[in-house]
Amino acid sequence: CNCDSSWSGGPTEWRRVAAMATVYDVKMAHHEEPQVASHLLASIPHGTYLENFHPKRDPIWHNIIANRPQLKDGNLTLTDNPGLGWELDRDYIKKYRISERVTEAK
């Protein structure tokens, strides 16, 4: 089952699909978005593969996450940091920012 959490209702719904797939002995994958898919697939025993694209095809995955897990021997080792574990590359964000909006508290 190649389910996409961004189109199917989010990570919780994706895990519900994964639970149903277990009942029918169906392997799970995730369509695109390796920054989220890697964590979802690591959370189940019947995950199969992670789609990972060339940096020109998926520049956000390859550039905006400063501590992006590196692919080695076909595997990713995820961080132990809270949540998705991302540390954003502020310089990359600044490079492509259109404007900087500052809201003052009154």
Where are the regions that the model predicts?
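C-terminal extensions of enzymes
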Residues: 64-106
